[in-house]
Amino acid sequence: MTMEPNSTTSDHILDWLEGSVSFFPSFLDEPCNNSGYIQEYHLWDQYQTDANTGSSPNATNSTTATIVATSATSTTSLEPCGSNNNQPLSDLPKKRNATDESSLKPPQNKNKRIKTRPMNEPENGDAVRKNKKGGAKANGSNCNSGNSKEGRWAEQLLNPCAAAIAGGNVNRVQHLLYVLHELASPTGDPNHRLAAHGLRALTHHLSSSSSSPTSSGTITFASTEPRFFQKSLLKFYEVSPWFSFPNNIANASILQVLAEEANITSRTLHILDIGVSHGVQWPTLLDALSRRSGGPPSVVRLTVVTAENDQNMETPFSKAPPGYNYYPRLLGYAQSININLQINRIENHSLQTLNAQSISASPDEILIVCAQFRLHHLNHNSPDERSEFLKVLRNMEPRGVILSENNTECCCSGCGNFAAGFTRRVEYLWRFLDSTSSAFKGRESDERRVMEGEAAKALTNQREMNEEKEKWCGRMKEAGFAGEVFGEDAVDGGRALLRKYDSNWEMKVEEKNTSVGLWWKGQPVSFCSLWKLDGNDQGGTS
């Protein structure tokens, strides 16, 4: 299926910043900044074509859609907590007024909260810890609840409840569920919200029903209207580096790989997108390609592998709502900056069965794989789908592979019992909720609720099988890849981007400069790594 962009050209992306630059005064002055990440948020407003126009997003089995634009003619502690380690109930937050039994959401006039210290008030008279970056401001939750477990009362209820479930202690389970129900709320500080999401997940686990936990009232990507989904996604990219940072590093890595190739202007750049950006990542890259000193590639092919409906419906951040279609906007923007862009969409196609033929790869093109936050859903036990897929990528002989993943331990049933896995899931969600409180400066917003509801799928999704960075690096090496050192542009650009966010965010360059990590309050969140074919590897095929 072929789609043509709007025939009217638009102003350059820099013109769309008019009236918006004041939001980022210091960042734009940075010598190594990647201003495209600011610009791209305003790109989508330029093309106000309905999100439902163009090709239908409804997937059919192993469907491939081709879309073309041309610049000329447009054809925690991981061990379960025992009861003797639990916080006394007298130390827990004061009981809230009764909540609605069905949704956990309290009435507007009954929204009692725990009285705590102001977010930046020191404990026991200690001085407030200085910001690591002098020019940055720490917003939202900046108390002792980040690096330390102190003050994180929701986990002190959720984790013992999971341990009681695993141990079959019915009385204790009932008691802790009751306390959680009294304290949980979808609004308020991160503890209240974590308690609400955790209570819903535990209830779902105990239920014999196979219905999705997201049907109980939580707002997620799939339940939103396409325009609001787009608005929420762009807002999140503006206020949090959770995804914008790895996307920034990935785009810089693509440019780094491209710079090492010859005859760029007469060749095709083919990007295999196995990610969760839903198009937000690519305007910045297209803009950078249009400004290359030697000119852009003759053709830029973007092959988007969407998440499978049957397998990844509950996978966080991977599925857009029905009707969401960013392709016309992206094609229109590419045309306006003289980039010959082609978009190929592969739907309902399992990652394990991808090959050079299914993505229509050709030997003379520059193939770069961008795999972000999707591969950890592949099984790593028996069968080991994860290692097998990396070998599939190796057999495609890409010029570069960018791997971005959550940097946390696996929480599947094969790597521990229910209590241990649930504790790790709760730890992941705490970091997300705590960081979004800072990102949105503690304000309630529908955009924040959508992102948090989507992240909360990690508590119930059985395909959420993370691995730490070291294990991922080992898998890549076993598959026949060698780590590539990040260039200065990628590292400096990442640091410059991070300066505009809360000072509790931190970037760490690791693994001999072949991995860049994103950390929140001293704890790892994700990593981004760059890989090339290992010249010493003689196998590679399977």
From Swiss-Prot:
Residues 367-452 are annotated as: PFYRE. The keyword Repeat does not apply. Residues 145-532 form the GRAS domain. One of its GO terms (biological process) is nodulation. Induction: Induced in roots after inoculation with Mesorhizobium loti. Induced in roots by infection with arbuscular mycorrhizal fungus Rhizophagus irregularis. Keywords: Nodulation, Nucleus, Transcription, Transcription regulation. Its main location: nucleus. Residues 233-332 are annotated as: VHIID. One of its GO terms (cellular component) is nucleus. Residues 152-214 are annotated as: Leucine repeat I (LRI). Residues 136-148 have a biased composition (Low complexity). PANTHER family: OSJNBA0084A10.13 PROTEIN-RELATED. This is Protein NODULATION SIGNALING PATHWAY 1. The lineage of its organism: Eukaryota, Viridiplantae, Streptophyta, Embryophyta, Tracheophyta. The gene is NSP1.
